[in-house]
Each structure stands twice: as C-alpha cells, then as structure tokens.
C-alpha cells in the first residue's frame, strides 16, 4: 500500500517515527471503527485508517507520551 494523501512527510512532521505513526494510526482507526466520533467534519478517505491518517495530518490526533508503554527486557 502506498500513502499518497496525506503525504508521509506531513505525517512524519507530526509524529517522531514511522513506527509511532503506524501504531497511532492503527489505534485511532480501531477507535473510529468502534464508534468514537471523528475529529474532522469531512474526509477524502472512506476507510478508517485513511481517516485516522487525515486526523493525524491535521494535528487533531497526537501521541500522549504520558501513556506510552515501554517494556524492556534484561
């Protein structure tokens, strides 16, 4: 799958890594599919992942570092 809108450059300006972007988009897409209200009125994409990416690009959805989980193994 190739992302053309929103551009990957715009998305990465909002999130610090591709990994964080993919996790954030997946979590938001699940929330949208579960019935959470969207943060934008109009979307170019019909699918939940596309809508999540549009919300991230618009700055409506961000990573909350206070709730980030890090598991380290010795």
UniProtKB/Swiss-Prot annotation:
SMART domains: RNA_pol_Rpb6 (SM01409). Keywords: DNA-directed RNA polymerase, Nucleotidyltransferase, Transcription, Transferase. InterPro entries: DNA-dir_RNA_pol_omega (IPR003716), Pol_omega/Rpo6/RPB6 (IPR006110), RPB6/omega-like_sf (IPR036161). Its EC number is 2.7.7.6. GO terms for molecular function: DNA binding; DNA-directed RNA polymerase activity. One of its GO terms (biological process) is DNA-templated transcription. Coiled coil: none annotated. It catalyses: RNA(n) + a ribonucleoside 5'-triphosphate = RNA(n+1) + diphosphate. One of its GO terms (cellular component) is DNA-directed RNA polymerase complex. It comes from the Bacteria. Belongs to the RNA polymerase subunit omega family. The RNAP catalytic core consists of 2 alpha, 1 beta, 1 beta' and 1 omega subunit. When a sigma factor is associated with the core the holoenzyme is formed, which can initiate transcription. Promotes RNA polymerase assembly. Latches the N- and C-terminal regions of the beta' subunit thereby facilitating its interaction with the beta and alpha subunits. This is DNA-directed RNA polymerase subunit omega. The lineage of its organism: Bacteria, Bacillati, Bacillota, Bacilli, Lactobacillales.
């Amino acid at each position: 799958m190739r992302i053309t809108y929103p551009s990957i450059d715009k998305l990465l300006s909002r999130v610090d890594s591709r990994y964080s972007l993919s996790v954030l988009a997946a979590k938001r897409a699940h929330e949208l599919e579960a019935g959470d209200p969207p943060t934008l009125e109009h979307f170019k994409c019909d699918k939940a992942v596309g809508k999540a990416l549009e919300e991230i690009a618009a700055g409506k959805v961000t990573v909350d570092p206070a709730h980030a989980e890090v598991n380290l193994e010795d």
